[in-house]
Every structure is written in structure tokens, then in C-alpha cells.
């Protein structure tokens, strides 16, 4: 269960603007379905396109740029997140952004993959990811406005099951379709159609109004700014921000492990990658999300997140030192995927425990942007490490950063604890 501190803070954070509070929450499986397009577009890039990159003349470092282009907008999305809070309703934003994301995945699949088209493809990926970020924002805003404090762990699990399950769906199914269908664009068309089907789950959600409709546009902007400043002036909000910006529990190695040249170190091919980094990984990661949500019902999310970060570092070390066989690639990829699910559920619980309900899209995506920053730069660094020193060194590099991040956070707890900030 959440601590009384979390419950009191979450309740008080949402109290001033009663129009944003929704008394009846849907079953959390709704968040799973609604969040699938967000995860699936990311999986299409990080698994399907990334695996094929080195087969089409790109280096491992260049292949890492594909996921880097996607994550670039994901750690900058705090800039446009306030638009979701102060303009259209969350439902309208979801339908618009999901439709445009469907167009985006079609465009990505239609661009030929190779050194000569890399620049164009990176631009398409970045634009599609920018639009896709609004899919996530709209769901996060509705979810934050309907989740009672004592359900944070449970909701976090279902929510991240949609994110990471979607990554597995977009990656595994996307790669299989790209390899089996006669034309690459057909895979994008099928993925886009699946995105649009997820809109049907909106009928089970309340239509949370934009803050501008409740208080006027200028007042809404002021409120969003005030809510954000108030959150970051608390010990809980500041510590959550510090933990998010550190390279803890990122799962960044997954993007590198999907590349054909890296997977070949263990003797793994397209089928193993599609299953272990795609479809099966999605299922295993979803299981990790539920285990992480259960854990966060019993531990403070900060404690759970830090511990999971150390566990993920240990998994990377073990994968790096074990024999380089296909069976080891399969086993450790699945263990790694489970640990990533734990980490992502703990991240969502950490954020929901800190943001309350007002200006939810903005506040959630400030934390998400902070968390995506280390995922972005560490992913690029791991690609370079794999290029220069090999797959084993890449995994040990990730583990080193993960342990260092937890040490820095432990020291930050001492410093913030001595401050005069509100709890």
C-alpha cells in the first residue's frame, strides 16, 4: 500500500481544481490498450528498423541513431506538453495524435533503409515520434485524473504493460511483417490500422476537459506553471526528478541488442530477435510490469526503482560474462526484459506519487522527459561502445552507469533530506 505521505500529497495536489477530478476510474486494462500505439511505434523503430539497419549497410553507431532520433523528441516533449493541458480535451488529442502516428509508421516503412536515405529516415522518425508523444500525454493526463492514491501501483503495472507490450508488438510483429511481406510499406499500413483500433477503448474513459475550458487560457497557463513549480519545490518532487535524470533502470542496452551485428555475437538471427526482443519480450516485460506494480504497492516507489536499477545492472553483467551462445542470448534477453518491466512500472508509480492530478500532462511529461534523456544519450553511447569494443563491453558499460547512478541518488537523498523543502 502507499504510505500516508503519498496519499495525502496526491489528494492535496488535485484538490484546488475540482473540475479535473473524476470520481469513477475505468478498469486499468483500458490504459494498457490506449497506450499500445505509443509503445508500438517506439518498438517499430527500436527493434524492427534497428535490426535491419546493419543488414542494409549501416554501422552499429548509425543504427543506434534510429532509436536516438525517436528518443530525442521524447526527452524534449516537456516543451509541448502544456498544450495538452490547456487546449483540446484529452480524448480529442488522443484520436488526432493516434491517427497521425498511424501515418507516421506508414511513412517510416516506406522510406528505403540504407546510408543514402538515413538522413530522410531520421527526420521522419523524429517527426513521427513528436506526434506520438501526444498519444502518451493524453493517456497520462486522463489516467492521473482518475487514479486514487491507493491504486497507483496497480494502475502503473497495467499502464506500462501497454507501453512495453506495445514495444514488443511493434518490434516483433513489425520485423516479421517487414521480412515476410512483399513491400515494406505494407507492414506500416497494418501497424497503422492496429493503432486506430485502440481508439475504441476511449469509450470507457471520462472526457477530461482542458484546463483552459475550466479557467480561461491565460489562467490555465498560469496554473500549469504554478503546479509545476510547486511540485518541484517539494522533497518528493525534487528527488523524483533527480532519480529520473540518472542512468538508473533505463534498459538502454535493449536497443543495441536488437542490431543484427550485435545479436550475431551470440549467433542470434532475425527470428530470435523478433521473438526475444519483440513479441516474447513484450509478454515477459508486461509480466515484469505487474510484478513491479505489486512491489510498489508495498515499498516506496523511490526505493523500488533504485533496487530494480541495481538488479538490471546485475543482469547486464551476467549477460556480458556468460558464454556467447544463442541459448544465452534467449535466456538473458528475457530476464533483461522482465527487469525492464519492473523498472518502468516503478517509474510510473514514482511519478504518479509525486504529481497529483492538476496539470497532469505537463508534470508527468517533465518527469518522462528527464527519464528519457539518459535513455537517449546512454543508448547512443552503448552503440558506440559495441562498435568499438564489442557486445560484452557494451553491457558492462551500461551496468557501470546504472550502479553509479544509484550511488549518486543515495547521496542526493542525504542532501535533500537536510533541506527545508516541504515533504
PLM regions: where:
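C-terminal ends and interior cores of transmembrane alpha-helices
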Residues: 99-115, 310-324
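C-terminal transmembrane helical hairpin of 12-TM major facilitator-type secondary transporters
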Residues: 302-347
Amino acid at each position: 500500500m502507499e504510505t500516508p505521505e503519498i496519499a495525502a500529497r496526491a489528494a492535496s495536489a488535485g484538490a484546488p481544481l475540482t473540475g479535473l477530478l473524476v470520481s469513477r476510474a475505468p478498469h486499468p486494462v483500458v490504459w494498457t490498450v490506449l497506450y499500445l500505439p505509443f509503445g508500438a511505434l517506439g518498438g517499430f523503430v527500436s527493434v524492427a528498423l534497428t535490426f535491419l539497419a546493419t543488414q542494409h549497410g549501416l554501422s552499429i553507431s548509425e543504427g543506434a541513431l534510429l532509436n536516438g532520433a525517436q528518443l530525442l523528441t521524447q526527452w524534449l516533449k516537456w516543451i509541448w506538453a502544456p498544450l495538452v493541458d490547456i487546449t483540446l480535451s484529452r480524448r480529442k488529442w488522443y484520436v488526432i495524435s493516434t491517427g497521425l502516428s498511424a501515418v507516421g509508421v506508414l511513412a517510416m516503412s516506406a522510406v528505403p533503409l540504407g546510408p543514402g536515405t538515413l538522413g530522410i529516415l531520421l527526420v521522419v522518425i523524429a517527426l513521427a515520434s513528436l506526434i506520438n508523444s501526444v498519444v502518451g500525454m493524453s493517456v497520462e493526463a486522463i489516467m492521473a485524473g482518475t487514479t486514487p492514491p491507493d491504486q497507483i501501483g496497480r494502475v502503473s503495472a497495467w499502464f506500462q504493460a501497454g507501453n512495453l507490450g506495445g514495444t514488443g508488438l511493434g518490434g516483433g510483429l513489425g520485423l516479421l511483417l517487414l521480412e515476410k511481406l512483399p513491400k515494406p510499406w505494407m507492414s506500416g499500413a497494418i501497424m497503422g490500422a492496429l493503432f486506430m483500433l485502440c481508439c475504441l477503448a476511449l469509450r470507457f474513459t471520462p472526457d477530461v476537459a482542458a484546463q483552459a475550458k475550466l479557467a480561461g487560457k491565460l489562467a490555465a497557463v498560469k496554473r500549469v506553471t504554478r503546479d509545476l513549480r510547486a511540485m518541484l519545490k517539494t522533497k518528493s518532487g525534487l528527488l523524483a526528478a533527480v532519480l529520473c535524470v540518472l542512468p538508473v533502470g533505463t534498459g538502454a542496452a535493449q536497443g543495441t541488442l536488437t542490431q543484427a551485428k550485435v545479436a550475431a555475437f551470440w549467433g542470434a538471427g532475425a527470428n530470435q530477435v523478433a521473438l526475444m526482443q519483440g513479441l516474447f519480450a513484450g509478454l515477459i516485460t508486461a509480466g515484469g510490469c505487474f510484478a513491479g506494480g505489486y512491489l510498489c504497492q508495498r515499498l516506496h516507489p523511490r526505493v523500488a526503482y533504485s533496487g530494480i536499477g541495481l538488479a538490471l545492472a546485475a543482469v547486464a553483467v551476467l549477460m556480458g560474462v556468460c558464454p556467447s551462445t544463442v541459448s544465452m542470448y534467449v535466456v538473458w534477453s528475457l530476464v533483461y526484459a522482465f527487469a525492464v518491466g519492473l523498472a518502468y512500472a516503478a517509474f510510473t508509480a514514482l511519478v504518479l506519487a509525486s504529481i497529483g492530478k492538476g496539470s497532469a500532462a505537463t508534470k508527468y511529461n517533465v518527469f518522462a522527459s528527464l527519464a528519457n534523456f539518459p535513455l537517449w544519450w546512454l543508448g547512443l553511447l552503448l552503440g558506440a561502445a559495441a562498435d568499438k569494443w564489442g557486445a560484452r563491453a557494451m553491457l558492462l558499460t551500461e551496468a557501470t552507469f546504472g550502479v553509479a547512478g544509484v550511488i549518486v541518488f543515495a547521496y542526493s537523498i542525504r542532501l535533500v533530506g537536510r533541506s527545508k523543502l516541504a515533504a
